[in-house]
């Protein structure tokens, strides 16, 4: 057997590539280099681990940021979804209900009525041979003494008839109550609870202007039989100014009329259906309104007394006459009216904010006037009223007639609203209970329709308001009803308002007008601006003369300041008494004039057995 060395040589001889190669292992060098290599490998692994941790941290941070962003987006989406749900439930659903009622119920009915109306007109204008033509005498041969537009008269008459029909059909579904309003039984002897509900929901032009921040002032509102009318001054800011620093205001006098509707929100909603907007002019400063028979009538004039001269009355005074139907029609009018005095004793006319009525095609208002025979007929009455403890009106300098020593009488203004009637204002007058201030007079129709209620508002911290009766036939007569005091030594018909004691209530800063409610028993409402609470309030006072009871409800205002004006108008609706108010105050913080408009629902519940 060959030795090991020979076998190694033989191996390298057979393998050519390694024939001249020798591997020499240096054990000392291996012992030195092996730890260095291990340290290098460990260092590289450590750097890799740090890099991986850094990458993981960056990705974790990005994931956290993305998660927060997704959460914010989800929160925003949830809020938007809730807002959409609110809009659908509380806004769109009632709106769709209204649209459905209009489209599905009322519109087809109105089209049916309109079709019947047109069909009747066709039959009317194309009658059978035996038809009596006397019914269309006005359209064929109007009387010569009446000056009318022959071509348009029949069309305008048809338009007014159609409007009346549409108004009646629209009001069929309303919940207007014509009976007692306070919802109390006569045998209620226990305590009562008064609850209120406020709403500023409206579909009116004034609501739009108020929402835009326009200045609204001198607003009066009138309601009746499911309709409403109002007039006010509005100042609109310039929207097209070239430079934002330049701001100017254009003033307008606005008239609007509409119906009071139930839109599924639980409150009555004023829905404007017709309006007129005129640039502010001197003859539009003071306006009085009358509502009825599906139309609104207004008389406006400058804010100053009107001097009456028999024979040429109204020559120097411009009186604006406005008539609007609940729906616009060619019969709407905006023109100047003339005064016609049939009484030569009249010499002065004093108009402020008055509410009137429309009956038998005629608008009627009651206003203070002066007569040349005032001292002859009422001199003794005034003298006796001012003898012992003279009330403030005896030495008043707040109103021109009283300052001049005149004794105002009651004037009744009427204007016919027919298409064939000229815009002429007739005036008659008569003396009655003493008139002590010029805060306005309002007319209301009594429940039985045999007379009118004539109200004068309270005088702040001085006198109570009065309710008188006014009868036109056979002759004008004004008689006291409540809240007046007889002056025995002044003659048979000598009455004054009820004056308060010298201790005035300093918390009551202003009184409103006095509103008569449509009920069998005489019921009326007035309001005061009260500052006795932390929050200023409009306090509504409800009086029932038939039940010898009274109630009140304070409505807290979101504004504070010195009151400038307070006007209310009340009506029954769905077993509640609702009162619309317009309150204007000088803000105690900013010194600017601000207003508050809305309706307050008052429900009085008897808690007795």
Swiss-Prot record:
<dbReference type="GO" id="GO:0033644">
    <property type="term" value="C:host cell membrane"/>
</dbReference>
<dbReference type="InterPro" id="IPR000665">
    <property type="entry name" value="Hemagglutn/HN"/>
</dbReference>
<comment type="similarity">
    <text>Belongs to the paramyxoviruses hemagglutinin-neuraminidase family. Non-sialidase subfamily.</text>
</comment>
<dbReference type="Pfam" id="PF00423">
    <property type="entry name" value="HN"/>
</dbReference>
<feature type="glycosylation site" description="N-linked (GlcNAc...) asparagine; by host">
    <location>
        <position position="200"/>
    </location>
</feature>
<dbReference type="GO" id="GO:0016020">
    <property type="term" value="C:membrane"/>
</dbReference>
<keyword id="KW-0812">Transmembrane</keyword>
<feature type="transmembrane region" description="Helical; Signal-anchor for type II membrane protein">
    <location>
        <begin position="35"/>
        <end position="58"/>
    </location>
</feature>
<keyword id="KW-1160">Virus entry into host cell</keyword>
<keyword id="KW-0348">Hemagglutinin</keyword>
<protein>
    <recommendedName>
        <fullName>Hemagglutinin glycoprotein</fullName>
    </recommendedName>
</protein>
<keyword id="KW-1133">Transmembrane helix</keyword>
<keyword id="KW-0945">Host-virus interaction</keyword>
<dbReference type="GO" id="GO:0046718">
    <property type="term" value="P:symbiont entry into host cell"/>
</dbReference>
<feature type="glycosylation site" description="N-linked (GlcNAc...) asparagine; by host">
    <location>
        <position position="215"/>
    </location>
</feature>
<dbReference type="GO" id="GO:0019031">
    <property type="term" value="C:viral envelope"/>
</dbReference>
<feature type="glycosylation site" description="N-linked (GlcNAc...) asparagine; by host">
    <location>
        <position position="168"/>
    </location>
</feature>
<keyword id="KW-0735">Signal-anchor</keyword>
<keyword id="KW-1161">Viral attachment to host cell</keyword>
<keyword id="KW-0261">Viral envelope protein</keyword>
<feature type="topological domain" description="Virion surface">
    <location>
        <begin position="59"/>
        <end position="609"/>
    </location>
</feature>
<dbReference type="GO" id="GO:0046789">
    <property type="term" value="F:host cell surface receptor binding"/>
</dbReference>
<keyword id="KW-1043">Host membrane</keyword>
<feature type="glycosylation site" description="N-linked (GlcNAc...) asparagine; by host">
    <location>
        <position position="187"/>
    </location>
</feature>
<feature type="topological domain" description="Intravirion">
    <location>
        <begin position="1"/>
        <end position="34"/>
    </location>
</feature>
<feature type="glycosylation site" description="N-linked (GlcNAc...) asparagine; by host">
    <location>
        <position position="395"/>
    </location>
</feature>
<dbReference type="GO" id="GO:0055036">
    <property type="term" value="C:virion membrane"/>
</dbReference>
<keyword id="KW-0472">Membrane</keyword>
<keyword id="KW-0325">Glycoprotein</keyword>
<comment type="function">
    <text>Attaches the virus to cell receptors and thereby initiating infection. Binding of H protein to the receptor induces a conformational change that allows the F protein to trigger virion/cell membranes fusion. Down-regulates human MCP/CD46 cell surface expression.</text>
</comment>
<keyword id="KW-0946">Virion</keyword>
<dbReference type="InterPro" id="IPR049617">
    <property type="entry name" value="MV-h_C"/>
</dbReference>
<dbReference type="InterPro" id="IPR036278">
    <property type="entry name" value="Sialidase_sf"/>
</dbReference>
<dbReference type="GO" id="GO:0019062">
    <property type="term" value="P:virion attachment to host cell"/>
</dbReference>
């Amino acid at each position: 057997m060959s030795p090991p060395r020979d076998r190694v040589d033989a191996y390298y001889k057979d393998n050519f590539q390694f024939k001249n190669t020798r591997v020499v292992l240096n054990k000392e060098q291996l012992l030195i280099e092996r730890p260095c290599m291990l340290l290098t490998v460990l260092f590289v692994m450590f750097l890799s681990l740090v890099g991986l941790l850094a990458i993981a941290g960056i990705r974790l941070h990005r994931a956290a940021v993305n998660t927060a962003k997704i959460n914010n987006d989800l929160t925003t989406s949830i809020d938007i979804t809730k807002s959409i749900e609110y809009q659908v439930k509380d806004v769109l659903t009632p709106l769709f209900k209204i649209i459905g009622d209009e489209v599905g119920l009322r519109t087809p009915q109105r089209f049916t009525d309109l079709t019947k109306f047109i069909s009747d007109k066709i039959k009317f204008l194309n009658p059978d041979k035996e038809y009596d033509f006397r019914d269309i005498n006005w359209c064929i041969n109007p009387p010569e003494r009446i000056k009318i537009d022959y071509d348009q008269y029949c069309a305008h008459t048809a338009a007014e008839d159609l409007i009346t029909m549409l108004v009646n059909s629209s009001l069929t579904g309303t919940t207007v109550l014509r009976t007692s309003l306070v919802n109390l039984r006569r045998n209620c002897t226990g305590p009562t609870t008064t609850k209120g509900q406020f709403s500023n929901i409206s579909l009116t032009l004034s609501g739009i202007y108020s929402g835009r921040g326009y200045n609204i002032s001198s607003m009066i509102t009138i309601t009746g039989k499911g309709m409403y009318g109002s007039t006010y001054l509005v100042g609109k800011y310039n929207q097209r100014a070239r430079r934002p620093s330049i701001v100017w205001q254009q003033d307008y006098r606005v008239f609007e009329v509409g119906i009071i509707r139930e839109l599924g929100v639980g409150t009555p909603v004023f829905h404007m259906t017709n309006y007129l907007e005129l640039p502010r002019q001197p003859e539009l400063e003071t306006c009085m309104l009358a509502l009825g028979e599906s139309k609104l009538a207004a008389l406006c004039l400058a804010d100053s007394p009107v001097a009456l001269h028999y024979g040429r009355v109204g020559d120097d005074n411009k009186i604006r006459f406005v008539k609007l139907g609940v729906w616009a029609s060619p019969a709407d009018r905006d023109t100047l009216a003339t005064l016609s005095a049939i009484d030569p004793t009249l010499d002065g006319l004093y108009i402020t904010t008055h509410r009137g009525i429309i009956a038998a095609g005629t608008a009627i208002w009651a206003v203070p006037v002066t007569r040349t025979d005032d001292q002859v007929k009422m001199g003794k009455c005034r003298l006796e009223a001012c003898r012992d403890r003279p009330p403030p009106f005896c030495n008043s300098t707040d109103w021109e007639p009283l300052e001049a020593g005149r004794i105002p009488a009651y004037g009744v203004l009427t204007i016919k609203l027919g298409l064939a009637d000229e815009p002429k204002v007739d005036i008659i007058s008569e003396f009655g209970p003493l008139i002590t201030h010029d805060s306005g007079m309002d007319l209301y129709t009594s429940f039985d329709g045999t007379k009118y209620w004539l109200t004068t508002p309270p005088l702040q911290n001085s006198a109570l308001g009065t309710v008188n009766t006014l009868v036109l036939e056979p002759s004008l007569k004004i008689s006291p009803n409540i809240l007046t005091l007889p002056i025995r030594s002044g003659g048979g018909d000598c009455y004054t308002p009820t004056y308060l004691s010298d201790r005035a209530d300093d918390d009551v800063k202003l009184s409103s007008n006095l509103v008569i409610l449509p009920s069998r028993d005489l019921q009326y409402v007035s309001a005061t601006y009260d500052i006795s609470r932390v929050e200023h309030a409009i306090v509504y006072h409800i009086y029932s003369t038939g039940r010898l009871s009274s109630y009140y409800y304070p409505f807290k205002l979101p504004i504070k300041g010195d009151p400038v004006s307070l006007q209310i108008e009340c009506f029954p609706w769905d077993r509640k008494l609702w009162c619309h108010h317009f309150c204007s105050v000088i803000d105690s913080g900013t010194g600017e004039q601000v207003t508050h408009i809305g309706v307050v629902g008052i429900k009085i519940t008897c808690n007795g057995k």
